[in-house]
């Protein structure tokens, strides 16, 4: 199915609800998303995000998902920073996209590169994919991401390295997670996600409120040398 995330039936109830409640719009949204994904350089990142946010808003409304945003005013005025959210589920990136007006790209593990729907979303936001079993390739991606930040764009990286299977509990951060920020000498923005595991990673269609908290940024001067 075009909304199959490879996680079994537990994801499908809410996804089907999102589709059914937007049945008339789904063909148009899917074609639009695929066209943007196939022509990533034809549109600006802002245009990609405008399209993506429309889809996310419609999906949220149809799927009983409310996204509450806190602290968006804490984001640095100038682009060129790295956001470090906790990693709860497949919905994380969509929640952040819906919670703030800024554009960003994502550093993700290569295992999610070809998941339908997410594949198209990742193409639109110019995501970078890391092979965690290949140190040389991983360092290359880190350098590429740092260059993206130096160009004045924003990057998301999940420092836990994988999704927590324990709800809102944090996992230990991976060593090397902050190399992108160190190389780019840019502000770090901690992002706290709450209940992001519920929409796509739990077997329920009950209304859920997802929280995205943008915490105070940490300037390079405060973490250099750590």
Cite the ranges covered by each PLM segment:
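Catalytic core of membrane glycerolipid acyltransferases/transacylases, capturing the structured
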Residues: 33-37, 47-49, 62-63, 77-135
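Short gly/ser/thr-rich secondary-structure transition/capping motifs
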Residues: 61-70, 138-139, 194-196
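Residue-level preference for the first positions of well-ordered beta-strands
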Residues: 80-82, 154-158
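Aromatic (phenylalanine/tyrosine) cluster motif
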Residues: 2-5
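A cross-family acyltransferase "interaction/gating" segment
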Residues: 117-120, 153-156, 165-226
């Amino acid at each position: 199915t075009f909304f199959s995330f490879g996680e079994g039936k537990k994801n499908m109830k809410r996804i089907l609800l999102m589709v059914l409640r937007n049945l008339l719009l789904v063909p148009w949204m899917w074609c639009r998303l695929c066209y943007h994904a196939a022509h990533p350089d034809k549109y600006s990142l802002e245009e990609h995000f405008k399209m993506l946010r429309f889809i996310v808003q419609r999906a949220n409304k149809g799927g009983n998902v409310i996204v509450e945003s806190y602290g968006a005013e804490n984001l640095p005025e100038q682009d060129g920073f790295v956001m470090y959210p906790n990693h709860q589920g497949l919905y994380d990136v969509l929640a952040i996209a819906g919670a703030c007006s800024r554009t960003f790209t994502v550093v993700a593990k290569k295992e999610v590169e070809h998941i339908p729907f997410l594949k198209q979303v990742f193409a639109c936001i110019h995501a970078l994919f890391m092979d965690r079993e290949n140190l040389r390739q991983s360092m290359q991606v880190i350098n590429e991401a740092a260059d993206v930040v130096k160009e004045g764009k924003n990057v998301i990286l999940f420092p836990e390295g994988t999704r927590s299977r324990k709800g809102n509990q944090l996992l230990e951060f991976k060593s090397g997670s902050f190399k992108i920020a160190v190389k780019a000498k840019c502000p770090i923005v901690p992002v706290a996600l709450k209940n992001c595991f519920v929409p796509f990673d739990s077997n329920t269609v009950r209304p859920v409120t997802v929280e995205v908290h943008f915490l105070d940024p940490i300037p390079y001067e405060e973490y250099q040398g750590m």
